[in-house]
Amino acid sequence: YNGLPMDVAKVLVQDYLERYPAPKRMLIDITGCDRTNDELMAGFLSYSGQSFRLDTLIHNKLEKVWWGGKVSALFRYNNEIFQRALSHRNQTDAGWLLDRVISPKLATEVAQHQYPLEIHPYLLQQLREICAEAQTRGVDVRLVISPYFPQFAQNVANLDALKKAAEQATGLSVTDYSRALSDPSAFGDFMHPNIKGSKSFVDLMRNDGVLP
């Protein structure tokens, strides 16, 4: 999910591994350790009744939101997460990639846009625990940094520091694709490859053995 912080990702991964057969390989983009996202976390209140881990996380991090869900059941569903779930309920998940090309105007303004990554020890700990749990179940975990628009990666502060911190926290190497795509038409915006770029990204990961 776009903007999903690593603490929410951890409980979702733990629930998945507990309920379903473990995948052979799992890819994690370490930029999910960049920042917390309480607003997005609150949206998962819709599903807290189906996950003790999720319920506990929301209770510990957002106690007022958690109690709001106890006082009013409808409160649980007044959020973007549930609205998106309704929208996508009868649709395939095979078409979620961006189907647009970054506008020429925005592309020429790349030097004006800065993106300071943050380094959160708490979220790095969540990443470490995800990797450790998956590995105990035989999952081959690979860490990556996804591609950024050409020239934008140099505007992302602390990217190398975050990569180093993730490697130290997990003991795994991070494959950095932040500068891997040089074609501007492969992006829908500065941070998201479009369909064309995603195909190129997948090909790169296959060539590198990151994907089987």
Which sequence ranges carry the predicted segments?
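C-terminal regions of proteins
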Residues: 157-212
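A generic secondary-structure signal
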Residues: 12-19, 129-133, 204, 208
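Alpha-helical scaffolding within the catalytic cores
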Residues: 11-15, 124-130, 157-161
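Loop/turn elements at helix/coil->beta-strand transitions in domains of secreted/extracellular proteins
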Residues: 22-25, 136-142, 170-172
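Conserved SGNH/GDSL esterase-like catalytic core that processes O-acyl groups on lipids
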Residues: 1-51
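Secreted/periplasmic serine-hydrolase-like ester/acetyl group-modifying domain
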Residues: 27-30, 39-137
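Acidic-and-aromatic substrate-binding clefts and catalytic sites of carbohydrate-active enzymes
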Residues: 3-7, 118-123, 149-158
